[in-house]
From Swiss-Prot:
Pfam families: DASH_Hsk3. The gene is dad5. Component of the DASH complex consisting of ask1, dad1, dad2, dad3, dad4, dam1, duo1, dad5, spc19 and spc34, with a stoichiometry of one copy of each subunit per complex. Multiple DASH complexes oligomerize to form a ring that encircles spindle microtubules and organizes the rod-like NDC80 complexes of the outer kinetochore. DASH complex oligomerization strengthens microtubule attachments. On cytoplasmic microtubules, DASH complexes appear to form patches instead of rings. InterPro entries: Hsk3, Hsk3-like. Residues 1-20 have a biased composition (Low complexity). This is DASH complex subunit DAD5. Keywords: Cell cycle, Cell division, Centromere, Chromosome, Cytoplasm, Cytoskeleton, Kinetochore, Mitosis, Nucleus.
Length: 94
């Protein structure tokens, strides 16, 4: 048995596209890519707008959290002071 060769056979292509056809194909492809790019830019603009709104809301939430943390610290501090003053009053003989 004889092995077939691995070397590709040469095929001559007689129907290669003309330069004007290639140019038309490339222009159509560029137009498609440009429309996709414009669509993506529009989506990006919408996402940036939403992100700006969300960033402001997150800033306000951060300020609210900080104020709650400071208020709870003050309440805990006042409760500790009150508890220690009550303990001192009980220890003092009259």
């Amino acid at each position: 048995m004889r092995r077939s060769t691995i070397v590709p056979t040469s095929r001559t292509s007689s129907s290669s596209p003309s330069p004007s056809q290639m140019k038309s194909f490339q222009m159509n492809r560029l137009v498609d890519q440009l429309s996709k790019l414009q669509s993506n830019m529009s989506h990006l603009e919408n996402h940036l707008h939403v992100t700006a709104i969300q960033a402001e809301a997150i800033r306000r939430l951060g300020a609210l959290q900080a104020s709650l943390l400071m208020a709870s610290g003050r309440v805990m501090s006042e409760a500790r002071i009150q508890k220690s003053s009550d303990a001192v009053e009980e220890d003092v003989p009259m």
